[in-house]
Amino acid sequence: MSSLREIILDTETTGLDPQQGHRIIEIGAIEMVNKVLTGKHFHCYINPERDMPFEAYKIHGISGEFLKDKPLFHTIANDFLKFIADSTLIIHNAPFDIKFLNHELSLLKRTEIKFLELTNTIDTLVMARSMFPGARYSLDALCKRFKVDNSGRQLHGALKDAALLAEVYVALTGGRQSTFKMIDKPNEINNLTVKCIEVQKIKRSIVVKPTKEELQKHKEFIDKILIQA
């Protein structure tokens, strides 16, 4: 049986509309295989080549000064596209992130690059609206509903929010499978941090209830991302 690779993804931006000159400033993406968080993730801050509006700064706390020495999007594009290749993207309010990512890709003016498609995404906002009509659907609201600890989320952050969304997505789809074993092997690639892990062999077709030890390892992994982001 083939593995199901999903990427939980989030971005932070300078504003709401790329057509008004707004750009992506942070990308966070976390790998999940057969509903198991593998520990592998992609994270990068990006120099937007423009100022940071105060309204955006109040949301994520990322300043223009902080981003001055960060890479431009074109320098990290290949690594990002390689990381998400052949995977379903899990995004909360997918049209927003896809719109911004495709705008950044269009600025590269590289004909060989294909734009991202909404048909290859799962929108957790749409899922939540379908499952809980009339409820609140923000990430914070869903964390509260599923008892996901978001106490450290004072400001938005792409990797932090992707980690929280991973927990929410697993809850929305009925629970996690098996476990993983962390192996710390950080590699710095164009200001990206990729951590490798060893996934234990599992029975792909069986959903199992996690043990206390597995839940603790899972919590430690999420906490590690929240601290590093």
Swiss-Prot record:
InterPro entries: DnaQ (IPR006054), DnaQ_proteo (IPR006309), Exonuclease_RNaseT/DNA_pol3 (IPR013520), RNaseH-like_sf (IPR012337), RNaseH_sf (IPR036397). It catalyses: DNA(n) + a 2'-deoxyribonucleoside 5'-triphosphate = DNA(n+1) + diphosphate. Binds 2 divalent metal cations. Magnesium or manganese. One of its GO terms (cellular component) is cytosol. Coiled coil: none annotated. A divalent metal cation 1 binds at residues 10, 12, 161. A divalent metal cation 2 binds at residue 10. The active site is at 156 (proton acceptor). GO terms for molecular function: 3'-5' exonuclease activity; DNA binding; DNA-directed DNA polymerase activity; metal ion binding. Its cofactor is Mg(2+); Mn(2+). CDD domains: DNA_pol_III_epsilon_Ecoli_like. Its EC number is 2.7.7.7. DNA polymerase III is a complex, multichain enzyme responsible for most of the replicative synthesis in bacteria. The epsilon subunit contain the editing function and is a proofreading 3'-5' exonuclease. This is DNA polymerase III subunit epsilon. The gene is dnaQ.
